[in-house]
Amino acid sequence: MSSELLQEVPKSIEHVKHIILILSGKGGVGKSSVTTQVALTLVNKGFNVGVLDIDLTGPSLPRMFGVENKQVHQSTQGWVPVSVYNNNNNQGTDSKRGNLSLMSLGFLLGDRGNSVVWRGPKKTAMIKQFLKDVVWGSTETPLDYLLIDTPPGTSDEHIAIAEELRWANPIDGAIIVTTPQQVATADVRKEINFCKKVNFQILGIVENMSGFICPHCSECTNIFSSGGGKALSEQLNLTYLGNVPIDPQFVELVELQNEQENKKLIELYDDCELKPILNGIVDKILDKNLPSRI
């Protein structure tokens, strides 16, 4: 990497090895759920993971991770992301796990019901601040993966993050989340075109809500159509990372950790039917052996 380019890299991400965006062509496909589970899976594999939520008008990740009531703190280097899971405080059976931290506008709103009614320039400024002023990792403890959860479609937030990340190359690329229905896969094509225009590598497609896991017998039934994501991957010569069914148990685990402070989602997730499925998806990404940024 040239010295000129190094000068442009935000100091906040100079200790980040890998950057992955999670995108979706339309809303309601469960993108934030996939982001949450990819983060949990990487942490379970021993990686230190940070999650940046740039869905400014619908920041749901603080609740997904059970840290809605936490606050962002300021340090001499910048904003410190909220710690979701710190393995330094959980030795023993958890010693192989990594650490997990989160930054989201949800921590700054004060009330969960507060709405964000911002025009493009203010959104762009907020995303720049998130990327440049949040301290991700350190020389002693670098961040292995920074996952960036984006809003659906291609909006001001996407343009802003693409502009800011142009100095962060090489970033790993993007995971695109869709559902099996044609109305969702049609919008995925727009997201793919966006990635090509901004030179984001597409790591693969995840077909979410592909089937329904019965809470009584654990049998998976295709209540919707299935195979749309896989067919699109084959048609466009992209990696098909896998399909994730709807599992009511995962929703229950998210709510359980919010109701009981001593429960952490990463520990509850060990018994979730979706865990081996996400393991397979993450392994396909790891098998690409993408180069580290540092």
Swiss-Prot record:
Binds 4 [4Fe-4S] clusters per heterotetramer. Contains two stable clusters in the N-termini of NBP35 and two labile, bridging clusters between subunits of the NBP35-CFD1 heterotetramer. One of its GO terms (molecular function) is ATP hydrolysis activity. It is found in: Cytoplasm. The keyword NAD does not apply. GO terms for cellular component: cytosol; cytosolic [4Fe-4S] assembly scaffold complex. ATP binds at G25, K26, G27, G28, V29, G30, K31, S32. It holds the Pfam family ParA. Keywords: 4Fe-4S, ATP-binding, Cytoplasm, Iron, Iron-sulfur, Metal-binding, Nucleotide-binding. It comes from the Eukaryota. SUPFAM superfamilies: P-loop containing nucleoside triphosphate hydrolases. Gene3D superfamilies: P-loop containing nucleotide triphosphate hydrolases (3.40.50.300). Its main location: cytoplasm. [4Fe-4S] cluster binds at C214, C217. Its cofactor is [4Fe-4S] cluster. GO terms for biological process: iron-sulfur cluster assembly; tRNA wobble uridine modification. Belongs to the Mrp/NBP35 ATP-binding proteins family. NUBP2/CFD1 subfamily. Heterotetramer of 2 NBP35 and 2 CFD1 chains. Component of the cytosolic iron-sulfur (Fe/S) protein assembly (CIA) machinery. Required for maturation of extramitochondrial Fe-S proteins. The NBP35-CFD1 heterotetramer forms a Fe-S scaffold complex, mediating the de novo assembly of an Fe-S cluster and its transfer to target apoproteins. Required for biogenesis and export of both ribosomal subunits, which may reflect a role in assembly of the Fe/S clusters in RLI1, a protein which performs rRNA processing and ribosome export. This is Cytosolic Fe-S cluster assembly factor CFD1.
